[in-house]
A protein has these predicted regions:
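Catalytic Walker B motif of ABC-type/P-loop ATPase nucleotide-binding domains
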Residues: 150-153
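ABC ATPase nucleotide-binding domains
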Residues: 224-250
């Protein structure tokens, strides 16, 4: 089942195209990694897909009313700092303020706490946590929204290696349970290992879409990222470890 459809989506800043004529679909049971160098348009694409910024073309999410959108997609932006001095539990409950179906909200919140490793943090004050811990709180808030689709902008940025791995595994588990997950990433190795589909952007354009083995090729990495990588297959998935910058481009 398709949860998000983009048709010829474009965003311009003045005369400059930031996202240029992108068409794609995100389905249930998919963990999709959105990758590309700095300035490729990843954040802009996510915001346009949600209808948060002006765009041309079509996004199936942006067409929905705010109520329908809040029931369809949860959003975790790149900004991580929490400025309200309330408990972790109260912060996560903010994800359920939008109208929702009649579900066991306490069970959903407890599940979000458990998935993000915050069960013992529920009474801690959010503003007193570290940056990485606050990122996990905001992720739990998005999970508490209990939507079929999750969009997250660099959700593992600033996390320690162990938490990055557990967070990526959690996203994979959510996809296996029937959700669609679209996340932007800078770590190509984690994207290749955990994601079921890769979307590679270059200068705002869709360069390649497909499974990691198909997309994380020397040709694509050299053209888009100007790097060479070590490739291997394991029982955990594809390894794609950057090892060499080909030439300075600045």
């Amino acid at each position: 089942m398709t949860l998000l459809t983009l048709n010829n989506l474009s965003v311009r800043r003045g005369q400059c195209p930031v996202v240029d004529d992108v068409s794609l679909k995100i389905n249930r049971n998919e963990l999709v990694g959105l990758v590309g160098p700095n300035g490729a348009g990843k954040t802009t694409l996510l915001k346009a897909a949600l209808g948060l910024i002006e765009h041309t073309g079509n996004s199936s999410l942006a067409k929905l009313s705010l109520k329908e959108r809040s029931l369809t997609a949860a959003w975790m932006p790149q900004e991580r700092e929490i400025n309200w001095p309330i408990s972790v539990l109260e912060t996560i409950k903010l994800g359920q303020l939008s109208p929702s179906l009649k579900l066991d909200k306490d069970k959903i919140i407890n599940d979000a706490l458990d998935r993000t490793g915050l069960t013992n943090y529920r009474e801690r004050i959010s503003t007193e946590l570290s940056g990485g811990e606050q990122a996990r709180v905001l992720l739990a808030r998005a999970l508490a929204q209990n939507t079929p689709l999750i969009l997250a902008d660099e959700p593992i940025a600033g996390l320690d290696p162990a938490t990055q791995l557990t967070t990526m595994k959690m996203f994979g588990d959510l996809a296996k349970e029937g959700k669609g997950v679209l996340i932007s990433l800078h770590d190509l190795n984690l994207a290749a290992t955990f994601c079921t589909k890769i979307i590679m952007l270059d200068k705002g354009q869709l360069h390649a879409v497909g499974n990691p083995a198909k997309i994380m090729t020397d040709e694509n990495l050299e053209k888009v990222f100007n790097i060479r990588a070590y490739h291997a297959r394991t029982d955990k998935g594809i390894i794609c470890q950057p090892i060499e910058v080909l030439s300075h481009s600045y």
